[in-house]
């Protein structure tokens, strides 16, 4: 995959629940600590090397940000780092929270 793709919240939720893809959250640490999707990996500049070393690069990665904008650049960047399939989740965390409010947790 040379270019990231977008994925709807519903499609992302289904792939995530089925274990078909990993979900990464690129929001700032305070926002992530205040609330995030259960099981989401907090991907930052500091955690990126460990993520790439531990993640099966053939397994799709779905990137979640605030509103679905920053995730596009992050998804494209992950492709340049060896991830084979990357998606930007449409609507981001805010839209996911409105659609599926009971799937979050805080630190």
UniProtKB/Swiss-Prot annotation:
Keywords: Cytoplasm, Transferase. GO terms for molecular function: thiosulfate-cyanide sulfurtransferase activity. It catalyses: thiosulfate + hydrogen cyanide = thiocyanate + sulfite + 2 H(+); thiosulfate + [thioredoxin]-dithiol = [thioredoxin]-disulfide + hydrogen sulfide + sulfite + 2 H(+). CDD domains: GlpE_ST. Transmembrane segments: none annotated. Its main location: cytoplasm. The active site is at 65 (cysteine persulfide intermediate). One of its GO terms (cellular component) is cytoplasm. Its EC number is 2.8.1.1. It is found in: Cytoplasm. Residues 17-105 form the Rhodanese domain. Transferase that catalyzes the transfer of sulfur from thiosulfate to thiophilic acceptors such as cyanide or dithiols. May function in a CysM-independent thiosulfate assimilation pathway by catalyzing the conversion of thiosulfate to sulfite, which can then be used for L-cysteine biosynthesis. Belongs to the GlpE family. PANTHER family: FAD-DEPENDENT OXIDOREDUCTASE (PTHR43031), THIOSULFATE SULFURTRANSFERASE GLPE (PTHR43031:SF6). This is Thiosulfate sulfurtransferase GlpE. It comes from Sodalis glossinidius (strain morsitans). The gene is glpE.
């Amino acid at each position: 995959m040379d270019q990231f793709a977008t994925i709807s919240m519903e499609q992302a939720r289904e792939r995530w629940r089925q274990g078909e893809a990993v979900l990464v959250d690129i929001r700032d640490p305070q926002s992530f600590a205040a609330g995030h999707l259960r099981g989401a990996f907090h991907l930052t500049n500091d955690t990126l090397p460990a993520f790439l070393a531990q993640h099966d690069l053939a397994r799709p990665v779905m990137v979640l940000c605030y509103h679905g904008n920053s995730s596009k650049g992050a998804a494209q960047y992950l492709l340049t780092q060896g991830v084979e399939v990357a998606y930007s989740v449409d609507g981001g965390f805010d839209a996911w929270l409105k659609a599926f409010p009971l799937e979050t947790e805080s630190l």
